[in-house]
Amino acid sequence: MAQSAVVKNEIIEKFKTHEGDTGSSEVQIALLTDRIQYLTDHFKTHKKDHHSRQGLLKLVGQRRSLLDYLKKKNVTTYRELIKALGIRK
């Protein structure tokens, strides 16, 4: 299922760095995290949905790449974002 426009806009508003920001690394990571969480919940009930699992792995790799880029670019923003999203345990 695609993200609803309302949820997507809420995430963008929360993580934007400036007005009109929809494509910064922070926003992209937050949107990917939301999709990953949705798919993770989906797999709790649909254990044999292997096709979607491939998509999940692709999303996780995409998020990992963006996180690596952000860490290289700005470590403090990286740490704040991870804490806000609750990614690392």
UniProtKB/Swiss-Prot annotation:
SUPFAM superfamilies: S15/NS1 RNA-binding domain
Domain of life: Bacteria
GO cellular component: cytosolic small ribosomal subunit
The keyword RNA-binding belongs to this UniProt entry's keyword annotation: yes
Keywords, sorted A to Z: Ribonucleoprotein, Ribosomal protein, RNA-binding, rRNA-binding
InterPro entries: Ribosomal_uS15, Ribosomal_uS15_bac-type, uS15_NS1_RNA-bd_sf
Disulfide bond sites: none
UniProt xrefs under CDD domains: Ribosomal_S15p_S13e
Biological process according to GO: translation
MF terms (GO), sorted A to Z: rRNA binding; structural constituent of ribosome
Matches recorded under PROSITE patterns: RIBOSOMAL_S15
UniProt key word NADP: no
Family: Belongs to the universal ribosomal protein uS15 family.
Function of the molecule: One of the primary rRNA binding proteins, it binds directly to 16S rRNA where it helps nucleate assembly of the platform of the 30S subunit by binding and bridging several RNA helices of the 16S rRNA.
Protein name, UniProt field: Small ribosomal subunit protein uS15
Organism of this sequence: Desulfotalea psychrophila (strain LSv54 / DSM 12343)
